[in-house]
UniProtKB/Swiss-Prot annotation:
Residues binding ATP: 202-217, 350-355, 434, 456, 554
Taxonomic lineage from the root: Eukaryota, Fungi, Dikarya, Ascomycota, Pezizomycotina
Annotated region described as SBD2, given as residue ranges: 351-413
Function recorded in the entry: Acyl-CoA ligase; part of the inp gene cluster that mediates the biosynthesis of fellutamide B, a mycotoxin that acts as a proteasome inhibitor. In the first step of fellutabmide B biosynthesis inpC activates 3-hydroxydodecanoic acid to generate 3-hydroxydodecanoyl-AMP that is then loaded onto the T0 domain of inpB. The 3-hydroxydodecanoyl-S-phosphopantetheinyl-T0 is sequentially extended with L-Asn and L-Gln by the two CAT modules of inpB. The linear lipodipeptide from inpB is then transferred onto inpA for the addition of the third amino acid, L-Leu.
Disruption phenotype: Eliminates the production of fellutamides.
Organism: Emericella nidulans (strain FGSC A4 / ATCC 38163 / CBS 112.46 / NRRL 194 / M139)
Molecular-function GO terms, alphabetical: ATP binding; CoA-ligase activity
SUPFAM superfamilies hit by this protein: Acetyl-CoA synthetase-like
Protein family according to the UniProt entry: Belongs to the ATP-dependent AMP-binding enzyme family.
Keywords: ATP-binding, Ligase, Nucleotide-binding
Protein name, as recorded: Acyl-CoA ligase inpC
Gene: inpC
Annotated stretches, region: SBD1: 280-350
Pathway note: Secondary metabolite biosynthesis
Length: 583
């Protein structure tokens, strides 16, 4: 059975297949595309992109229609800044490919990606410049270059680190404005479907085929993929938003696909996007009051922190907020209920997506919701479910591995043909590795299928022959006031086959007076009051200071599981990963 978007949804416009991203954005909403900050005057994005492209062309000897795009790979290794997107679009303007690198990535991982792509040019910021220079030297690339992006907090300050002669993007733009115009991109019909725009690192939280270095795969995302997803998401929200623009909070890293697509999406539809260099809770809350922000794009751990520390929301005026969009991790109904109690006027809109789908697959319509679900498929997406026996699911409310088709799906993984073959089936469907269910509602006379992600396929455990999803336990524990963060993995058990094991970061302010054993007892009562026996934890709870995490903040469950495997089989206390420790 093929599951599709709601039949009542609006019709999607044709997706341009022969235009680069920056041309598509400027063509649609040039009146909105301004680069504004309190430190420098407003300039059109188009002007800045073109001037930077001219400078890069002169500096590097590149031109838009000469040479392979793979000979013009440029990395961006920086925290968020207004010129992050300007730099990426300037790279596209001269026919190049932009490789994203997360600021928390190790030097070894960045070096591996540079060697894989033969990248010799990096955009970075002053705080990351030493690492960037170290990697460029260690990679032994010819004629390495590093250019500096200014972060808001760095503007007007004396640099704490020497620049070592690197030019800033602002200097390049100023110089480029005086240079002759460069030729327009001359693309063949349909070239946008083949031309890679971004190389995006995947999260790798399950450790699938990863080495000890945990080098992430690079998803090849084309111009067509990004443009398609902009149109898909905007079309779906055209009904609820009725063409109205919003002021949105943006602190999600642009180096991660979720943050990247949101920045493109809000730019195209004309929203105001208040960009933060990095996440800081107090700064984010203050900006809500200052800019009267209406929409928050959050991830579940941040929502959990707000729910467990509600006093934070009283530090500033947050009355302007009307909606919270959440993704990049499971968001259970218990956490939604907890947020609703703290801020009942905020409408929570869960969604689902992957780096490999660039990015958005489902969005919640604020008028038609299903508690605990992840929204409806956006236009252009098709889905299938394959059950544990390898058979296709032919009904609603039956779980199976989610397979997808969408115009936004990547070309594949760079340099990893085996991984690419494994992630696509023989008919070209993307295997997500997520277990999902489609559920129907009939609100307002509209029959609506809702996507509900149950768990990661490889994270599902079997307890006494019954399938148990860690996300169910996690969502219950996340709603407990003493829990700041939680990750549940399956461990071997002689009697049941497997049992759930919870790693928990305690909230520093709530129930802090309880000793560990008393809190474990309270957590067990919390779980056992609502979940069946296969979900119970009993002694399988351990408190830690922090989790090993991926670059986008997801707990690395495979590291937690590795630390437990040997010790749990011997019925001894499990070892804690290197970057965690007991309370």
């Amino acid at each position: 059975m093929i599951f599709t978007p709601p039949v009542w949804g609006p019709e999607m416009m044709a997706i341009p297949a022969s235009r680069p991203i920056h041309e598509f954005l400027v063509e649609r909403d040039s009146r909105h595309l301004y680069d504004w900050s309190e430190e420098k005057p407003a300039l059109t994005i188009a002007d800045r992109v073109d001037a930077l492209a001219r400078s890069l062309g002169r500096e590097l000897g590149w031109s838009p229609n000469t040479g392979s795009p793979w000979s013009k790979v440029v990395g961006i290794f920086s925290f968020n800044t207004l010129d992050f997107l300007v730099a990426s679009w300037a790279i596209h303007r001269i026919g190049g490919i932009c490789m994203l690198m997360h600021p928390t990535s190790s030097a070894a991982e960045i070096k591996r990606h540079i060697e894989l792509t033969e990248c010799r040019v990096l955009f970075t910021c002053r705080s990351l410049l030493p690492t960037a220079n170290e990697v460029l030297v260690a990679s032994k690339v010819q004629d390495p270059r590093a250019y500096l992006l200014d972060l808001p907090e760095e503007l007007g300050r004396k640099p704490s680190l020497p620049d070592q002669g690197q030019q800033t993007v602002e200097q390049l733009i100023s110089a480029g404005a005086t240079l002759p115009l460069i030729e327009a991109l001359d693309w063949a019909e349909g070239q946008g479907k083949e031309q890679v725009a971004y190389l995006c690192p995947t999260s790798g939280t399950s450790g699938l085929q990863e080495s000890a270095l945990t080098v992430k795969k690079l998803a090849m995302i084309t111009h067509y993929n990004i443009i398609a997803n902009i149109i898909q998401a905007t079309t779906f929200e055209a009904g609820p938003k009725k063409g109205r623009t919003e002021v949105a909070l943006g602190f999600l890293p642009l180096s991660h696909s979720y943050g990247l697509i949101l920045a493109h999406l809000t730019a195209w539809r004309g929203d105001t996007y208040i960009l933060h260099a990095r996440f800081d809770m107090q700064a984010a809350l203050a900006s809500i009051e200052k800019y009267r922000i209406e929409r928050l794009y959050l991830v579940p751990p941040i929502i959990s922190a707000l729910v467990n520390n509600p006093f934070l929301l009283d530090l500033c005026d947050t009355s302007s907020v009307t909606s919270v969009v959440t993704g990049s991790g499971p968001f259970g109904p218990r956490l939604a209920e907890a947020l609703s109690r703290v801020r009942p006027s905020w409408q929570v809109l869960p969604g689902y997506g992957l780096t490999e789908t660039a990015v958005i697959i489902s969005i919640t319509d604020p008028n038609i919701t299903y508690p605990g679900a992840d929204g409806c498929l956006v236009p252009g997406v098709e889905a299938r479910l394959i059950n544990s026996n390898g058979n296709e699911v032919e009904a609603y409310n039956e779980p199976g591995e989610l397979l997808l088709k969408s115009p936004s799906i990547m070309k594949g993984y760079l340099g990893q043909e085996t991984a690419t073959r494994e992630v696509f089936d023989e008919q070209g469907w993307l295997r997500t590795g997520d277990i999902a269910v489609f559920r129907l509602t009939g609100q307002d006379g509209k029959v609506t299928p809702h996507l509900d992600i149950v768990d990661r396929k490889k994270d599902i455990m079997k307890v006494k022959g019954l399938q148990v999803a860690p996300v169910e336990i996690e969502s219950h524990l996340a709603a407990h006031p003493a829990v700041a963060e939680v990750a549940v993995v399956g461990v071997r058990d002689e009697d049941a086959g497997e049992r759930p094991y919870a790693f928990i970061v305690r909230s520093p302010r709530t129930m802090a007076d309880l000793d560990e054993e008393a809190l474990k007892a309270d957590l067990n009562r919390h779980v056992e009051a609502t979940l069946s026996e296969p979900h119970w934890l009993r002694k399988n709870i351990r408190f830690v200071e922090e989790f090993p995490k991926s670059s986008n903040g997801k707990p690395l469950k495979y590291k937690l599981k590795e630390s437990l495997a040997t010790s749990y089989a011997r019925k001894t206390s499990p070892a804690i990963p290197n970057n965690t420790r007991n309370r």
